[in-house]
């Protein structure tokens, strides 16, 4: 049995963006919205959706005449729900007759993480399955995790980007799982301040 180094898990995870679709189950008059609702943009010759920007929380919604919306920019599920409620409330305040409850479905969560370790990407590329690492093309290792089903871009600095999650818990699970796997494969070492090169 090999000696697995004792490296503490000190990862910091940040949700950067949540993209969700919202179904309103009714057709919408985007021209009426453009005339009534302030601070929206609608130019059907350029793009078929109406652009609705919120300042707090800072999200953008693309609203289509089919009653579908794409909401992007939220940093948490709670913020996403708050944004959708605020959009619906604003549309109703300006005379839009919206019936029914919106159905929200998260399509993608993008997160960043810092493992606070140095990752040996050459070794990880050799030992991990489902990965792609071509340092001449891109400095990070692309790892496709099966459970949860996410893609991780892992850098030698211990920083990473996670995409494809549908729930925030999946992001945290994926980061912990890849950390444990990298430790098990002896692909990480503690981050030392003096190792920084300027």
From Swiss-Prot:
Mapped Sequence repeat ranges: 15-91, 106-182
Pfam families for this protein: TBP
Superkingdom assignment: Archaea
GO molecular function: DNA binding; DNA-binding transcription factor activity
Annotated Gene3D superfamilies: TATA-Binding Protein (3.30.310.10)
Biological process (GO), any one: DNA-templated transcription initiation
Tagged with keyword Transcription: yes
Keywords: DNA-binding, Repeat, Transcription, Transcription regulation
Keyword DNA-binding attached: yes
UniProt xrefs under InterPro entries: TBP, TBP_archaea, TBP_CS, TBP_dom_sf
Family under the similarity heading: Belongs to the TBP family.
Free-text function comment from the UniProt entry: General factor that plays a role in the activation of archaeal genes transcribed by RNA polymerase. Binds specifically to the TATA box promoter element which lies close to the position of transcription initiation.
Annotated protein name in UniProt: TATA-box-binding protein
Species the sequence originates in: Sulfurisphaera tokodaii (strain DSM 16993 / JCM 10545 / NBRC 100140 / 7) (Sulfolobus tokodaii)
């Amino acid at each position: 049995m090999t000696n697995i180094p004792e490296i503490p898990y000190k990862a910091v995870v940040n949700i950067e963006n949540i993209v969700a679709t919202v179904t309103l189950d009714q057709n919408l008059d985007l021209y009426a919205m453009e005339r009534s609702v302030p601070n929206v943009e609608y130019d059907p010759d350029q793009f078929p959706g109406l652009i609705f920007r919120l300042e707090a929380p800072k999200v953008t919604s693309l609203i289509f005449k089919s009653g579908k919306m794409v909401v992007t920019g939220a940093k948490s599920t709670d913020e996403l729900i708050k944004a959708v409620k605020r959009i619906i409330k604003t549309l109703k305040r300006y005379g839009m007759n919206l019936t029914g409850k919106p159905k929200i479905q998260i399509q993608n969560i993008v997160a960043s993480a810092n493992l606070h370790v140095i990752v040996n990407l050459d070794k990880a590329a050799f030992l991990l399955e489902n990965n792609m690492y071509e340092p001449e093309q891109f400095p990070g290792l692309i790892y496709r995790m099966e459970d949860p089903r996410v893609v991780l871009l892992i850098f030698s600095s211990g920083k990473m980007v996670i995409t494809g999650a549908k729930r925030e818990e999946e992001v945290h699970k994926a980061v912990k799982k890849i950390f444990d796997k990298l430790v098990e494969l002896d692909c990480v070492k503690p981050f030392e301040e003096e190792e920084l090169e300027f």
